[in-house]
Amino acid sequence: MKVGVLALQGAVAEHIRLIEAVGGEGVVVKRAEQLAELDGLIIPGGESTTIGKLMRRYGFIEAIRDFSNQGKAVFGTCAGLIVIADKIAGQEEAHLGLMDMTVQRNAFGRQRESFETDLPVKGIDRPVRAVFIRAPLIDQVGNGVDVLSEYNGQIVAARQGHLLAASFHPELTDDSSMHAYFLDMIREAR
């Protein structure tokens, strides 16, 4: 099973390491044409506005929309969550607009307010280690979106069919459970 990690920004190598730890084949994605060979795609963190601009410049917007429209699994972490959302609070235009949710950028504060915690995640039998760095949150979800995890009453992980979103960075820990969950989603989508 080939899982790509969009290599425009973010902890690409760390995602690849965890994909491979749970039995997937990790692929560094630098060109839109590479999507054709993939079973799933991770859009990692970074800065969502910059990621959006780079996606437009390098032809990823329509390519990723087409990939998702084929029913292939997409996982957005931190800024990647913002990129796949269909609404961003305080912003007129979404980037990919794939997942029926409204998100708020930098909801957990600045860099110095970053933290780690263990979260219960629906569908995973033990708490998941989560790193929050200038993390967004999910303000609202539409019908058909399943809330997977909350932190202090705020939504931090959700799923809509073949789409998965997490406010946190699962790749910055040694906990591979979110990546295992994503690989299970890819198997379901086949």
From Swiss-Prot:
Report the InterPro entries cross-referenced here: Class_I_gatase-like (IPR029062), PdxT/SNO (IPR002161), PdxT/SNO_CS (IPR021196)
Tree of life domain = Bacteria
What keywords is this UniProt entry annotated with? Glutamine amidotransferase, Hydrolase, Lyase, Pyridoxal phosphate
**In its UniProt record, which GO terms are filed under biological process?**
glutamine catabolic process; pyridoxal phosphate biosynthetic process; pyridoxine metabolic process
What does UniProt give as GO cellular component?
A: cytosol; glutaminase complex
Keyword 4Fe-4S listed: no
Q: Which Pfam families match?
A: SNO
Q: Where do the catalytic residues lie?
A: 78 (nucleophile), 169 (charge relay system), 171 (charge relay system)
Binding site residues for L-glutamine: 46-48, 105, 133-134
Reaction catalysed by this enzyme? aldehydo-D-ribose 5-phosphate + D-glyceraldehyde 3-phosphate + L-glutamine = pyridoxal 5'-phosphate + L-glutamate + phosphate + 3 H2O + H(+); L-glutamine + H2O = L-glutamate + NH4(+)
Supply the EC number(s): 4.3.3.6, 3.5.1.2
Q: Which GO terms describe its molecular function?
A: glutaminase activity; pyridoxal 5'-phosphate synthase (glutamine hydrolysing) activity
Which Gene3D superfamilies does the entry link to?
3.40.50.880
Q: Specify the pathway.
A: Cofactor biosynthesis; pyridoxal 5'-phosphate biosynthesis
Family recorded in the similarity comment: Belongs to the glutaminase PdxT/SNO family.
Q: What does this protein do?
A: Catalyzes the hydrolysis of glutamine to glutamate and ammonia as part of the biosynthesis of pyridoxal 5'-phosphate. The resulting ammonia molecule is channeled to the active site of PdxS.
Q: What is this protein called?
A: Pyridoxal 5'-phosphate synthase subunit PdxT
Species whose genome carries this gene: Niallia circulans (Bacillus circulans)
